[in-house]
Amino acid sequence: MQTLFPEAPELHDSILKAYGDHYIANSTSDAWFEGISELLHDLKAQGLKLAVATGKNRRGLDRVIAKTQSTHLFDVTRAANETRSKPDPLMLQEILTVTGVNVEQAVMIGDSSYDLEMAQRLGMPRIGVGYGVHSVDVLQKFQPLTIAKNVQELHSFLRGYAQLSTVDVA
């Protein structure tokens, strides 16, 4: 909210509530992209720590996690209403503290400039996915390790990325 409406901090709570109510009332699907469930299960089976750093509020995040039956996959989750908003890196710092992972051993996977800027500001390696919010051109500005065109390409890249200890998904 600080990024979108910096001039009206007194309205942030009411805007978030209105957005959340509208999103819930009009959401047709909280499913993941095809292949994400398999990817997450594979990463977890490798012993990696998985985390979520989202712009959603806790209510929205919990709804998605419940619908996708993925509670067991994530070591920690952070929602926008629990910490500073993206692109402030505090959300990622909190995740690293909880997991005990060094920033160099983590990677942020994101589909928006806010995700990649947040990781860049912290010095965290980052991967863009070009099938989400922002275009490849926008994501490229944040110097990601790669930009995956689809989930299969992301999965293939992560298999070869040896220094991984934790994965943060946005």
Which role does the model predict for each range below?
Residues 146-150:
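Short acidic-hydrophobic, aromatic-tinged amphipathic segments that line or gate anion-handling sites
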Residues 124, 143-144:
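As written
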